[in-house]
Structure formats: C-alpha cells, structure tokens
Amino acid sequence: MQIFVKTLTGKTITLEVESSDTIDNVKSKIQDKEGIPPDQQRLIFAGKQLEDGRTLSDYNIQKESTLHLVLRLRGGMQIFVKTLTGKTITLEVESSDTIDNVKSKIQDKEGIPPDQQRLIFAGKQLEDGRTLSDYNIQKESTLHLVLRLRGGMQIFVKTLTGKTITLEVESSDTIDNVKSKIQDKEGIPPDQQRLIFAGKQLEDGRTLSDYNIQKESTLHLVLRLRGGMQIFVKTLTGKTITLEVESSDTIDNVKSKIQDKEGIPPDQQRLIFAGKQLEDGRTLSDYNIQKESTLHLVLRLRGGMQIFVKTLTGKTITLEVESSDTIDNVKSKIQDKEGIPPDQQRLIFAGKQLEDGRTLSDYNIQKESTLHLVLRLRGGI
C-alpha cells in the first residue's frame, strides 16, 4: 500500500509499504529516499510518536495514511513560535542559535523579514545578538511572534474579562478602523463595542492621534450588550468595578461576575444598594437597579460570630452573623432557618425592640449574645 510522510518543511514523501512493516523499516525507506539517518527521524501519527519495533498495523496505519516526520537534531531541539493570529510554527533549533538565526528560520518558513519580527518569551522581548540559552529557552518552549509594521505601532485592548488583545495600527486610524480590527480578531460587532482611553469614551470618526494614543497605549473595551446594561460596584478600598449585567440577573449571578473579576468568593461578598443588603435569590430588577447604578461591596470577613435567638416556645436558634449585619439581615437569616416572614418578627435585646435599619454593633450585640424573638401576629398591633 502507499502511505505519505510529511516533513516540517511541508514536503510530502510517498512510500510503498506493507502493514507488517516495522517503523524501523519505514525509517530505512525514508533514508533511501531522502538520505536522513533513521536515528535522526521521529515519526508521528495521530499525535503519537511511533516506536521502532512496532508495525504499521499495530498503529492502525492504513493505505494513504499520512505520517509526520520530525527531525531529531544532534544536540538540537524543537521550539514553537505562536503568531498573533494563533498559528503555531515549529522550528528545529540549537541552544546556541542566536535570536537572529531564529528570525531567519521564521523568514524561511513564513516569509516575514527579520526586521519586522519581534520575539517574546516569558514576557521579555528577545534581543538579536543573544542566544536561546541566554534566555533559558529549552526544548518545546513557546515564543510569541509580534509583527513590527513599518510606520505602524502596536496598541493593546483590554476586555472586561481581563483578556488583552494586541493590535497593529497607525496613528491615523479612526476609532471605527480599530473596532473593525477588534471584530476581525474577536468577532465582536463594532456596534457592540465601546472603547475607553484615559477615562474617555472614544468617538467613531476621530483618530488615535486625536486622542494622543501612542504606541503600546492600552484601551479598554466595554461591551454594549443588547438588552444588557452596565453597573458599577464600589469596594471599601474605593476601587470601582464595571460589570455587564441584565435586569433579570440574580444577586447570585452578580456575585459570580465579581468573583470572575476579583477572585472574591460569593460567600464573602455583601452587596448594598440604597442602604439595603441585597439577597442572593432576588434579581436586579426586584431592587430597581438600573443601568449605571452603583452597588457597594462589603467583605464578609471570616471571623464572624454566633448569636442565639430564643423563641417564646423556648426553642433556641443559632445564627452566624457579622457585627455589621443589620437587624433586617438577621430577620432574613431567621426566615431562612424557620420560615417566619421578617414582618412578623420582633427582636428584643436587653429589653429593647431592635429597629430594622440598625446594626448589631449599634446595639452592642456581641458573640454569643441571646436575642428574644416575639411574633407579631397578622391582625395584631
């Protein structure tokens, strides 16, 4: 039968083989055709490196299957070069190769002149005269290739998810042009993009130079969701987080978005709007939270405390609370545990009825304090 062997240079060799041929036999046939010694050949099929003593049938290699031939350089190694388009190039190199040499190999493969190439490894741009070993680049390391456009420049666009996109632009490009480039890379229609630089939203007809956007500037991309809206979340440190949400999102959903951005577990988040703590199962529209509303994020520090609530029947409930919890919050926790609606609860501590908007610390309620719960019967006064 015939099989094909594809080399890293893209050349395809055709071989006549039997299913019972060993990988050794195949390497000998390649040596006969191409002059490459078997000990410098690695054959790959279906992502697996083939072992010399095994046969083609062991690997289920059938007629017209294609094997990939990778050269094992004496003292050499393979590295990968990833381009901005996501394409990965494989190169055969030596540790002693200079960055210049590597750029020449990329030119041989891709036709990109070395003076338009910038190579990045571990966040550093590599200098032409240095060697791979100078940068501790080892076998199967991945370099990133960025193109240096003549007369152009690179800028960065950071999305709300934290992803950074690199764009090749000219100072004379309009914001429209930039949005088109983002669409090419990310598939986001221009009419759903808002670009922010130095706190200003950029207008479509203006140019990068109008906004003094220079090389390696970072723009921020905010999505304009159809039917969605943006809200802001302000932390106690004064930092403001921007979130893309829907009115139908639950407070749970919002906390998950904050976790995605800031890494704070939902169970440590308390969200406050218009002076009220927001409950997980309710939606933004339940609280009349509209576009560009600002919520306040308070962290629930581990290191809360327990208090007890004693009912008239003599039952004692244990609650996990914070000193900063409002009486409202406490009543919600009692509802969660006992099913009693907050408007039917009266809480008494040290002979005083507790008011909903006040906090436990306002009443000097400390760990292991006992509150008394009295029910307000419907129709009662």
From Swiss-Prot:
On whether Repeat is a keyword of this UniProt record, the answer is: yes
Q: Where in the cell is it found?
A: Cytoplasm; Nucleus
Which SMART domains does UniProt cross-reference here?
A: UBQ
PROSITE patterns per UniProt: UBIQUITIN_1, UBIQUITIN_2
Task: Name the keywords, alphabetized.
Answer: Cytoplasm, Isopeptide bond, Nucleus, Repeat, Ubl conjugation
The Ubiquitin-like domain covers which part of the protein? 1-76, 77-152, 153-228, 229-304, 305-380
State the signal peptide span. none
Q: At what sequence positions does the UniProt record place the cross-link Glycyl lysine isopeptide (Lys-Gly) (interchain with G-Cter in ubiquitin)?
A: K6, K11, K27, K29, K33, K48, K63
Crosslink site: Glycyl lysine isopeptide (Gly-Lys) (interchain with K-? in acceptor proteins): G76
Q: Which domain of life is it from?
A: Eukaryota
GO CC terms, sorted: cytoplasm; nucleus
Q: Which residues form the propeptide?
A: 381
Q: InterPro entries this protein is in?
A: Ubiquitin-like_dom, Ubiquitin-like_domsf, Ubiquitin_CS, Ubiquitin_dom, Ubiquitin_ubiquitin-like
Q: Does the keyword Chaperone apply?
A: no
What the protein does comes down to: Ubiquitin exists either covalently attached to another protein, or free (unanchored). When covalently bound, it is conjugated to target proteins via an isopeptide bond either as a monomer (monoubiquitin), a polymer linked via different Lys residues of the ubiquitin (polyubiquitin chains) or a linear polymer linked via the initiator Met of the ubiquitin (linear polyubiquitin chains).
Q: What is noted besides the main data? A: For the sake of clarity sequence features are annotated only for the first chain, and are not repeated for each of the following chains.
Q: Which family does it belong to?
A: Belongs to the ubiquitin family.
State what protein this is by name.
Polyubiquitin
- Gene name of this polypeptide: ubi4
